[in-house]
């Protein structure tokens, strides 16, 4: 781990309060830690880069929807170090400020990942309802709280936090739905002999380039758990 004890740490997470990111942060660091709610992935990274006592908690992968590309892209561009990871169950509930019938709902607020993870239920029960993306599910709860005939998708903890009614529990498409979060910081990471390593590589655009790289991992008997292609954002159709 890379958690320094020389100062009182602060942990930035994707808020507002009641988000799954906050839940992951508290599970990893303990509820007595100083937590800072941020409005975006970029804001979390900026906070950590600008403050040596900060750590950040970022959603990186969902068990059903795959990698969170917005996090991946921001991490690649930063100089932060991945210190640790934690996975938590993601149980999604449909919330509203009042106990209203599903047929009365006109708008649903949620993060794009929440929409994707519950799309089968939504298509079956609320197919005609307008879906509006927000930066986090907790933000969606706040939006719904201010909007009549609306609902949001979030955790039971968020429902309690913001005094929302639970219209339907566990609307996620898969019961064993989990999200993996990474902990990022400025400090070097000590080896534990049970580590994961993330690397970004840009190769020449030639036949066999990927095969050549994979051969090096094979020679060193390194197991690869994931390979992802992302645009370099420097030249069109160029990937790392």
Regions found by a protein language model. Give the residues of each.
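Domain-level signature for soluble enzymes in the chorismate/prephenate branch of the shikimate pathway
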Residues: 1-240
């Amino acid at each position: 781990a890379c958690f320094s004890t020389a100062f009182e740490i602060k942990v930035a997470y994707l808020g507002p309060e009641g988000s799954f990111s906050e839940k992951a942060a508290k599970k990893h660091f303990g509820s007595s830690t100083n937590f800072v709610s941020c409005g975006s992935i970029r804001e979390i990274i900026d906070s950590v880069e600008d403050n040596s006592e900060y750590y950040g908690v970022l959603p990186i992968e969902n068990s059903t929807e795959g990698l969170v590309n917005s996090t991946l892209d921001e991490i690649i561009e930063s100089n932060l170090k991945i210190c640790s990871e934690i996975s938590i169950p993601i149980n999604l509930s449909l919330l509203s400020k009042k106990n209203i019938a599903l047929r009365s709902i006109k708008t649903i607020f949620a993060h794009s990942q929440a929409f994707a993870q519950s799309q089968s239920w939504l298509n079956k029960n609320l197919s005609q309802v307008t879906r509006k993306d927000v930066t986090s599910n907790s933000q969606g709860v706040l939006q719904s709280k201010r909007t009549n005939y609306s609902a949001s998708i979030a955790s039971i903890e968020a429902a309690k936090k913001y005094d929302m009614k639970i219209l339907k529990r566990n609307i996620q498409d898969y019961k064993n739905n989990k999200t993996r979060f990474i902990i990022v910081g400025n400090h070097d990471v000590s080896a534990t002999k049970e580590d994961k390593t993330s690397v970004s590589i840009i190769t020449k655009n030639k036949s066999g380039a990927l095969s050549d790289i994979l051969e090096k991992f094979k020679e060193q008997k390194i197991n690869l758990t994931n390979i992802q292609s992302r645009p370099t954002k420097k030249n069109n159709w160029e990937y790392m």
